């Protein structure tokens, strides 16, 4: 496993990291023993960064992860959780200082730890950015001073939300950003933001290397917001890889983990075999010829992508549906 520095935090994270959203039991009842085995496989394979949120399964993911972490030496992993988004289905978003404090304490109890390495404002496209700057981030830094978290981050889908916060706060206020669906085979729009983020000293966490199912043989869910052009283009890429006996997920994960300025890419699963496959993928050399062929097939899509990415959503209701589908169906998974 390779490791990269996460911004200016001073820590080095595995290029492939574990998203525990699947532990929320959305598709089926959570099997705690399987969760424990999955996490053990991830850690034994060199993964050292774990991300979760109280929103995933409405605290079920944190609870299951806490059971899986029980007995594991704290120094073996870096742990991240979030505040602000609690239930997409119920529209429960609250970025107030009071809820933020209560949420982190509750998360620590569920996770069975005394502190998290990273606490993140979750899906800040749903928040009043004045509140994020003037209330939420100051509260997170207060919790940091109390020793409950080491670093502070922000997460979201539209890329423009990151400068809208970072340009309003002092350097060092935000240590990391988490972006999803913007560095993958069919959408590399995150690349344009990387020089800015490096200048700000902010570490980059990437997620959803398969575009929420676009780059998989199983295809996408009904709610997926991608256009017919993007869906068809990705389908051709999937079929091209299959014709060569390759699961495109392998190439997608390898590509997502290949950028030297992106510290880590999250994948999620509750199956030991699947996380083992992903670890094996990043340890094997990428087929550069196949990559060139797939990127050529996807070029008509890439030139259509706006600065906000292929999954850019204009309306708030559209964003809510996308994020609701994403987080409740745990499609960080490959």
How would you describe each model-predicted region?
Residues 1-77:
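N-terminal binding-site loop/beta-alpha segment at the start of enzyme catalytic domains
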Residues 6, 18, 35, 50, ...:
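Conserved, mostly hydrophobic/aromatic
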Residues 8, 66-74, 109-112, 166-170, ...:
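Acidic (Asp/Glu)-rich catalytic clusters
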Residues 21-33, 86-99, 127:
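Active-site mouth loops of central-metabolism enzymes
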Residues 29-42, 95-111, 158-167:
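Short, acidic/polar
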Residues 109-127:
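Active-site groove signature of glycoside hydrolases
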Residues 124-301:
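Beta/alpha (TIM)-barrel catalytic core signal, keyed to glycine-rich beta->alpha loops juxtaposed to Asp/Glu
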